A protein has these predicted regions:
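Short edge beta-strand/loop segments characteristic of extracellular beta-sandwich folds
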Residues: 63-67, 190-199
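Cytoplasmic C-terminal tails of single-pass
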Residues: 297-314
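Long, charge-rich C-terminal accessory regions
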Residues: 187-188, 244
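Generic recognition of long tandem-repeat/solenoid scaffolds
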Residues: 108-113, 192-196, 226-230
């Protein structure tokens, strides 16, 4: 009975510390933070935005903006990009989309953003590769806990989806090559050289920014259909965003904002040095053990000699 009383208060409560970014369907809007059947409606407003036209296999951007935000004392707010709200099999990947990056520095459809004190609006952006020809709805959803995380979680979703019509790619449309994958991660303090392959492009202009900041143009060099440019290093583990304006015989195109996240250097192990150090420790242990054993044997030998001498004298 005591155990049940201890467990019951937490069964419907939210996890104020979040679950981390990941690939989750809408069901996780409650199940990850408690019982999905005990969700309450969030008072926040969720709006999803995307171009109404995209081209098969090319990149486009989708954003979710949440206003009237209420969240836990930790400031975490979970954002979902979804292909429907059925609760299962409703990630963008299930509908054929491929997530290239998001503005929080990952490649997942679910991200947790840290909301500052007094902040009531926040936007998360995704760069995605379009699926096959057809019409595709996309939804935005959120979940969050109460102020102290002690009660049932809140879940909210966009009232209407944005419907994207995916069309065949026009023959002369300036575009990034299908095989191009923008870098998503790098180490703090390192500049990044981006080598960008294109098709039907004869001019490129690239600009970068800190999220929400002013854009700065960078020099671009070309080699046929390949274009190269450098993105500056950051001194902190923060993200920068960049995009390219592409010109050619067809209509001018602008890529989505790509996010490049800087991370602290990861601690690495020199396997050879670790192996040699381990062997040295084993040998040192064996030498110490043999030395102790030899000392013990010598001591036992001296005791036996003393006993023998006493017996002879007797």
């Amino acid at each position: 009975m005591v155990a049940m009383l201890l467990v019951l208060p937490t069964m419907g409560s939210a996890n104020p510390n979040g679950v981390g970014s990941g690939t989750f369907d809408a069901q996780c809007g409650g199940a990850c933070h408690g019982d999905a059947d005990m969700n309450r409606s969030s008072p926040a407003t969720v709006e999803v935005n995307a171009p109404t036209i995209a081209y098969e296999g090319l990149l486009t951007s989708v954003s979710i903006t949440v206003s009237d935000i209420e969240t836990t004392t930790s400031g975490l707010l979970g954002f979902f990009l979804l292909s429907d709200l059925s609760g299962a099999g409703d990630t963008p990947d299930d509908a054929g989309w491929t997530i290239i990056s998001n503005s929080e520095g990952g490649t997942e459809n679910y991200v947790e953003a840290l909301i500052g004190a007094g902040q009531t609006t926040h936007t998360v952006e995704w760069t995605v590769r379009a699926p096959g020809i057809g019409e595709y709805p996309l939804y935005g959803a959120i979940h969050h806990g109460t102020e102290d995380g002690s009660e049932a979680p809140f879940f909210g979703a966009s009232t209407t989806p944005v419907v994207v019509e995916v069309r065949p790619v026009p023959e002369d449309l300036p575009r990034l090559a299908a095989e191009f994958e923008p870098p998503a991660l790098r180490t703090v303090g390192e500049t990044t050289t981006v080598v960008m392959s294109t098709a039907f492009v004869n001019g490129v202009q690239v600009e970068w920014r800190l999220p929400g900041g002013e854009a700065t143009t960078v020099p671009v060099s070309s080699d046929g259909d390949t274009w190269s440019f450098e993105l500056p290093a950051t001194l902190q583990p923060v993200a920068i965003q960049w995009r390219a304006h592409l010109t050619g015989e067809g209509p001018e195109q602008t890529t989505p904002w790509f996010t490049l996240q800087s991370e602290e250097p990861r601690w690495t192990v020199n396997e050879s040095a670790a192996y040699l150090q381990s062997m040295a420790m084993v040998l040192a242990f064996m030498a110490a053990f043999l030395s102790l054993q030899r000392g013990r044997n010598d001591e036992e030998s001296l005791v036996k000699d003393d006993v023998f001498e006493e017996e002879v004298e007797a």
